[in-house]
């Protein structure tokens, strides 16, 4: 399945952004300007399956898929780097990580709606499940606009493979599904 998602940052996210990435509050105007430039470039999608057909995953109910911000976030960071604007490139990368975290939440909500179950745990390949599942996931969800390189790297760079454990009972707030979510890709 393919699901359009629209990640964005809330007012609460701005405070978290500054503390998480060690920016002083006086950088917020620059950060917001880069965010304003980036947001129209983000073309985010989740490609996923709720079939229980991955080898080596023994959960009773789960979904798996790929979440991407599209090429725009990568291109903006690269544009800044090409012009030797390192701080701006770093800010763009940090913003895209926050947007990707928000996209994971939206992916989990889409899975909940499709499956009529609750997302109770979100895992990234390489954490609890082997990276060797990536080609299988890629083949099953057939993501247009995402490429898997010969070295099992996903392009665009702001793309992640996830497995969501599902249950009939809600156990956690979606923001609490993954212990590594606050550390991911840093």
Predicted regions and their residues:
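Extended, compositionally biased
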Residues: 116-162
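Hydrophobic, well-ordered secondary-structure segments
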Residues: 104, 108, 134, 175-178
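A residue-level signal for conserved active-site and pocket-lining positions in enzyme catalytic cores
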Residues: 181
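Conserved active-site and cofactor/substrate-binding residues in soluble primary-metabolism enzymes
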Residues: 29, 33, 95-98, 102, ...
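Conserved mixed alpha/beta catalytic, RNA-binding, or beta-rich assembly cores of soluble enzyme
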Residues: 59-127
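Active-site helix-to-loop segments that bind/position phosphate- or nucleotide-bearing substrates
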Residues: 1-88
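Immediate flanking context of iron-sulfur cluster ligation sites
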Residues: 125, 160-178
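Conserved small/polar residues in nucleotide/adenosyl-binding loops
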Residues: 184-186
């Amino acid at each position: 399945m393919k699901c359009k998602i629209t990640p964005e940052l809330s007012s609460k996210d701005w405070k978290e952004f500054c503390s998480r990435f060690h920016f002083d509050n006086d950088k917020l105007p620059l950060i917001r300007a880069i965010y304003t430039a980036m947001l129209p470039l983000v073309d985010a999608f989740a490609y996923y399956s709720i079939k229980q057909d991955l080898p080596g995953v023994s959960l009773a109910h789960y979904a798996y898929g790929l979440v991407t911000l599209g090429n725009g976030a990568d291109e903006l960071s690269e544009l800044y780097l090409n012009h030797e604007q390192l701080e701006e490139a770093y800010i763009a990368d940090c913003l895209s990580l926050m947007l990707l975290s928000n996209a994971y939440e939206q992916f989990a909500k889409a899975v909940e709606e499709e499956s009529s179950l609750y997302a109770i745990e979100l895992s990234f390949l390489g954490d609890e499940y082997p990276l060797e599942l990536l080609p299988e996931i890629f083949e099953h969800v057939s993501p247009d606009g995402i490429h898997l390189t010969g070295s099992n790297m996903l392009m665009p760079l702001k793309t992640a493979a996830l497995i969501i454990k599902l249950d009939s009972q809600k156990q956690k707030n979606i923001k609490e599904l993954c212990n590594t979510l606050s550390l991911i890709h840093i």
